[in-house]
Structure formats: structure tokens, C-alpha cells
Amino acid sequence: DGDISVESLPEESWRKYVGGMGIGLYLYTKFGKISDPFSPENPLIITAGPLTGTPFPNSGRHEVVSRSPLTELFGEANSGGFFGNDLKKSGYDGMVIHGAADTPSIIFIDENIRIEKRPDLWGKDFYALRSELRREKKFSVMGLGRAGENRVLFSSIMNDEGRAAGRTGLGAVMGSKNLKAIAVKGNLQVPLADRKKFFDLTKKVSTYLISSPLTQGLNSNGSMIWMDMGQGMGDIPSNYFHDHNFDYDSLSSMKFHSVYKVTSYHCANCVIGCGRTVVKGSRSIDGPEYETVASFGPLLGNNNFDLILEWNDIINDKGMDTISTGVLISALNYFVKTGRISDKSISGYFDSTFSGIKNLIEDIAESRGIGNELKEGLERFALSRGIPRDEIATVKKMEIPMHDPRAFKLQGLGYATSTRGADHLQAEMYEVDMGVDHREIGIVSGDRWQVNTDERIMTLINSQNYRQIYNSAIICSYAKVNPEDVVEALNLSTGFDYTIDELMNIGALLLDEKRALNIRLGMKDTDDYLPSLVRKKIEGEPEESEIKDEEMESLLKRYNELRRSVS
């Protein structure tokens, strides 16, 4: 109905839920109802963290939560860029959007908050939308492409220069509300409990991060550095998770940077600069992330970088999650190639040069032809065509990312137990078991295939708990800040007196609350599951890489016992 109100939350809520994802969860349970994801009663919530808008390194992020139309569970997505920074500097920690507009609309936040009916912008893809709104004022724009308008279940909410709240399909929720965009411009100073000490800490952490080899690698190569690092570990799946037989060097970060004119992109307050912008013809386009290159490269069987750049550009403009889109299309290619699907409405898109993929992406985003079925995601579509569940690369209906569980077994257990579906960012065990650990909080690297001990499973649990704090603070996952510095940053910004033990307990409680909410939304214990497609041994690879059924059952059983013991 266009009503706008501003409310303050009690201090105890901030202490218990921190901000970002945590406060989003609190607001969802406070204002949300058990309803269809596309119901007006399903709120769309955008939040900043206590560090957002401050100079703390790599804190320029925001969180989006709602009930996911893809998983039908609690959906959460995190994005960088400048939107979160501007939201916080406009004087707000977040927003809860109820109902649905009767006409496509835009929310503007600058000196005041207003809702404008803008049917002229409905039908535009994201880049045109962004340009139009920036002509009016230098806004940070968060908005939809055509996929969100058409309620593609894995549509993303784009912002700024190719940044995306990508996973769980929250763009479709935004589209169901007839909300095309939110445009924000903020110039206020974010209050800090102890400004001098906070700035001193910021300098210390920035210096530490800049000197880190991981930071230097990401700055030089972007996230595509994993195309170079992961191949020797068997971590980059090819041929729809059936092997690792691919010329990975053809899509290496070295080749990318030598062939194309590339510049780096920094989100707000970022000291890393992992983003990439590519000059292609007369345009500068957003470069692909590792997950995009891997899912549209080796997973599909394509070594043409030009095609990946083109597809990534279209997917971002249409506003879809590149992981879900890439896994879906790679699965279809495999099913067509092996005769599992012979339907001409699908097989017609696939040939040896992948010339039909561009049309397939556009048809999905536009809900056109077979795209109207494919927009439901891989699991729903594959089951409707008789593909057995164990051959579908999803967990809780969300497509599996590009880190092979057979390379890092705890990553597989993390996929199975994640509250939002297959998710490599809720616990980055592929990094932990390569030595990026935090032993002081029980995150300890170990043998990537020997995981059947309490210490190893607790490493996953502790990593999951700590990730909740990162996503609530909010800090970019690439910034490996020492836990004691995270505690100090939160205390100096909020005035609270957190300890690391208290924050780890908060992380555990947030996961417990998300799981309890998911159960109310229909999740069952059997949904903690990993398909045998990504567990079975690949010919010629070590026996210990396989995750057999009995091992998976044992890991899940002990995980749940240990999770209950720390809750």
C-alpha cells in the first residue's frame, strides 16, 4: 500500500543477532509468515552489518534474506559492491519489504525514502536499468533483470558493477513484489563506539591482509586463480562431475590475463580487488568469477573463453545465478550427449561448438518455450524427465558449486548439512584443508580424505559457526581476518564486549535457528544428503577420494551428534 515506517530494534537484538544475516534472520522470524515464496506475506529483507559503511577492510557488503523459491527454505544471499555501504551511510541498517506493488516500482533512499511507480523500467535488463537510474543521480543500484521479473527460481539480485546476491533465487521474490530496483545514495558518517581505536585496528588489519599471499594472488588473478590451483587437487569437476579430464590450462587465469585487456575492480573498502572488468570490442564488461568459468568451462566441456565471457555478460544482465545456470546447462548437455534426454526442444540447443547456449540462456531468462520449465531449476526439471535423484547435482534443490567433494571430503559434508542448500561459502573446507585455518577457534587443516574423526568433523562445525559471524558482521569471505581482530572490530564499532567464545556460540545458535525455521518450512532430516554423482570414485583416481554410502551415513550421524553437543 506504499506505507513507509522507520523502527529501531532493541539493543539486545543487535547483541544476539549481530547484524547482516543474523539480524535478517531475526527480522524474518519477527515479521514473516509461513507462506508461499511469492506470496505478498513473504518479506524481502535487506541488511547491512555493524562493519558496513566503516573503513574496515572488505566490509562493503549487504545481505538479502527471504523464503527461497528455489529451495523453499530460508534463503540468504550476500553481495559486495557499494550498495551496502550507501545503505548504511543513508542512516539505515536494513529494510523489510512487505506486500506487493500493483505497478512496477522503485524504492529511492537518499535524503528521504520514497516509492515511485516506474512501469517504464519493467522489461529492461539490469545494465540498462542501472544506467537509467544513474542518469537521475549517482545512485548505487540494486535491481532485477528479466529473469527476476519472470520469476526464474534461480534469479539473482544484481547491484553496481556486476555484483550479485546470486544464490537461492531471491530475485524472483523481488520480482513477485513488482519491485524493479532499490536506488540508494548515502553521505552520513557511520557512528563508531571508539573511532580512534577502530581506525588504528583498520590500519593494522589492512596491512596484514595486503601482505597475505592469498590477497596478492587474488589481486593479480582474481577468483580465477582457483583454475590454476584447483586442477592439481582434482577439485574442478568436468563432464558434469563424471571426471577431471579437461585441458584446464586452456582456461587458466594466466591465459585470461594474457589474452584480454583486464582491469581489477574493488568493492567498497576492499584491499583485495578480486573483481575483473574486461574490454571486449567497444564495451567494458564484467569478467567472470571462478565458479562461472568452471561451470561453463570444464563442467560443460567448453574451452572457449570468448563464449564464457559472452554468456557471463548475458547472465548478469538478465539477473541469474551463474552457478545454478552453469550446472543446469552442463547437466542438460550431458543428458543429451548420453541419450538420457532426446527431446528436440532441448537437444536442439547443443552442438559441438555450443552455438545454441546463448539462446538457451535467453530463453530461460525470458521463460520462453522449454525455458519456462527449465526456470524451475535442475532438480525439478530432471525429476520430471525421469532422471534418478542420485544423478542430479543438487542439495536441497540448489545446484552444487565447483568444488568437488571427492577432492575435499569435508566440503561434501558441508554441502549436505548447509541450511541453504549446496553451498561452498558456508564452510570453505577446500581452503581449510589447504592450510587456511584458524586453530585458535578449532578450525584445523588436515588430511583432505581422512575425515572420520571428531576433530575433523568439529573443524567443519566450527567453520560453519564462524561463517555465520562473518556473514553477520559482514566481511568478505576472501578477507581472512584473524578471529581476535573480528572480535575487536565488532566491539569498537558497537560498544559491546563480545568475546570470541560468545561469538562462536552466537554462530551456533544462528545455525540452530535457521535449521528450526527450515523444519517449519518443510525440511526433513533426509534432506541432508549428497548425491552419489559427486561421491563415487572416478576411474584412475585414489580409492580414498570416494565417499561410499556407509561413510556418508556415518559422517552425517556423527555430525548431528556433535552439532547437538555444541548447541
Locate predicted features.
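Intrinsically disordered, low-complexity segments enriched in small residues
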Residues: 1-78, 82-567
